[in-house]
Amino acid sequence: MQLNVNDAQAIEVSELTFGGEFNETLVHQAVVAYMAGGRQGTKQQKTRSDVAGGGKRPWRQKGTGRARAGTTRGPIWRGGGVTFAARPQDHSQKLNKKMYRAALRSILAELVRSDRLVVVQDFAVEAPKTKDLLNKLNGMGLNDVLIVSDAVDQNLYLAARNLPHVDVRDVQGSDPVSLIAYEKVLITVSAVKKFEELLG
């Protein structure tokens, strides 16, 4: 199949990488697994056994008329522990490489179908100036965009760093969440070829 290049002739690309069907279930699984892998999972609360104190019983077992109590650190006491306290846990989910790559292929194909993939021969800025990059993107009618190149250009990265709706990634750093989060994906021809190598 062919992909139209913004500032040059169309290029021939792999049907497998850029022309497959959209598998919503698989993409959802990949996104959930990716997001879950980014969770810290370090939240921790104290149970009745973790809270300091409470060793001596507050009053004797019998004779006071009050309900029996053996500690002041039970969950029903002020200053006591939490009933079902949160513990550190690993939220990561297993996703096979084959499935992850298939999800990326599915996303790329859907970007092409929905006209959200803008292919250019090359994309760079001469100096790390945010204003220059903004003018360049506005000239192309892009304001909410992910820029994907073969290797991240330092000037481009610095110029885009302060723009809230612009992100710069290389092919290796592109993930399912970043690829679907932006209105448009601006990708260089060399990055297209790299995607074909990795996912073909």
UniProtKB/Swiss-Prot annotation:
Annotated membrane-spanning segments are none
Q: Which GO terms describe its cellular component?
A: ribonucleoprotein complex; ribosome
A biological process from GO: translation
Lineage top rank: taxon: Bacteria
Q: Which UniProt keywords apply?
A: Ribonucleoprotein, Ribosomal protein, RNA-binding, rRNA-binding
Q: Which InterPro entries match?
A: Ribosomal_uL4 (IPR002136), Ribosomal_uL4-like (IPR013005), Ribosomal_uL4_dom_sf (IPR023574)
GO: which molecular function terms? Answer: rRNA binding; structural constituent of ribosome
Annotated spans, Disordered: 38-72
The UniProt entry's sequence similarity note says:
Belongs to the universal ribosomal protein uL4 family.
Describe the protein's quaternary organization and the partners it interacts with: Part of the 50S ribosomal subunit.
Q: What does this protein do?
A: One of the primary rRNA binding proteins, this protein initially binds near the 5'-end of the 23S rRNA. It is important during the early stages of 50S assembly. It makes multiple contacts with different domains of the 23S rRNA in the assembled 50S subunit and ribosome.
Q: What is this protein called?
A: Large ribosomal subunit protein uL4
State the organism of origin: Pseudomonas entomophila (strain L48)
